């Protein structure tokens, strides 16, 4: 089933083919060149290529690996069984160290599972390496951070145009291989809307391509989240309007919405209450990694802002 997803079908197999900032790519290439990948924490936003980079490095050195999604299988029993069974045996391929990629490791329980993982990293250090990916490195306990080299997936503004064009070439090649007709300008708009979330770009293009082609009609479904509309509703304390806004916009990444609200605080909120608004946003941003219902969490966040923050 995964092969039907473009993000899997066209996932790069080596670091050279990954769309990454120059300095970051150089760092990862050094690990491959030395055939020695240390315990790593790859930190950055969703869809920027952390898991792809981890797989590509391991593929290039010819090592065996196991991928575990911590948000789905990250309970302590998984560590005690699956990880232990894999990490404690020698690779049958005779390529030396094996690796465990722990995707979305910031979802692991910091009181129980993360300390247990620290113990396994030490116990099996001779024949197994660990690569942890996360969106928020602050959610990983210091004991894990100190046992790993930390690699930040950060794109500077000066690098954005070059990376965007590089990915545009990649996307056009994929669309041509899939025999999908497309409007280049529309593809570029989609790319810049979700930059640097490459996974989101491909998923949106694949989803819309089912209609036969990528054209201007796609943009109707991808209108920017109207933060100004939300800010006005918060200012007027229109709870029903705020709730409707959430329902219509929560298909976007919740963390991206919170970031957009933060970016617009200074234009809409009285300076004296901005610090309090920031604390509220930070609290609910943290909670968003654990809640079962993002709509309720977002509404609780905005209700608190509406009632406790003074608007201009």
Name each model feature, range by range.
Residues 183-184, 193-206, 239-240, 254-256, ...:
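The conserved phosphate-sensing helix
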Residues 188-211, 244-247, 262:
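C-terminal helical "lid" of AAA+/P-loop NTPase domains
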């Amino acid at each position: 089933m995964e092969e039907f997803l473009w993000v899997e079908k066209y996932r790069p197999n080596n670091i050279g083919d990954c769309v990454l900032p120059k300095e970051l790519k150089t760092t990862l290439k050094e690990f491959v060149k030395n055939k020695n990948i240390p315990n790593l924490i790859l930190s950055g936003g969703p869809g920027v290529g952390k898991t792809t980079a981890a797989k590509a490095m391991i593929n290039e050195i010819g090592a065996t690996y196991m991928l575990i999604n911590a948000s789905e299988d990250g309970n302590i029993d998984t560590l005690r069984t699956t990880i232990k069974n894999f990490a404690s045996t020698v690779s049958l391929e005779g390529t030396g160290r094996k690796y465990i990629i722990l995707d979305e490791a910031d979802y692991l329980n910091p009181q129980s599972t993360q300390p247990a993982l620290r113990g396994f990293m030490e116990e099996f250090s001779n024949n197994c390496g660990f690569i942890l990916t996360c969106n928020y490195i602050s959610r990983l306990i210091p004991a894990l951070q100190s046992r790993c080299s930390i690699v930040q997936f950060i794109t500077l503004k000066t690098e954005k145009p070059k990376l965007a064009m590089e990915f545009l070439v990649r996307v056009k090649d994929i669309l041509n291989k899939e025999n999908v007709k497309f409007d280049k300008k529309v593809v570029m708009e989609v790319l810049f809307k979700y930059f640097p979330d490459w996974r989101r770009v491909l998923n949106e293009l694949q989803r819309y391509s089912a209609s036969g082609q990528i054209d201007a009609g796609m943009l109707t479904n991808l209108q920017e989240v109207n933060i100004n509309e939300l800010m006005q509703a918060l200012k007027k304390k229109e709870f029903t309007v705020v709730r409707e806004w959430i329902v219509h916009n929560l298909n976007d990444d919740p963390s991206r919405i919170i970031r957009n609200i933060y970016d617009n605080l200074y234009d809409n909120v009285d300076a004296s209450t901005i610090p309090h608004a920031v604390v509220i946003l930070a609290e609910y941003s943290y909670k968003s990694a654990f809640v079962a219902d993002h709509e309720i969490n977002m509404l609780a966040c905005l209700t608190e802002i509406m009632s406790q923050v003074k608007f201009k």
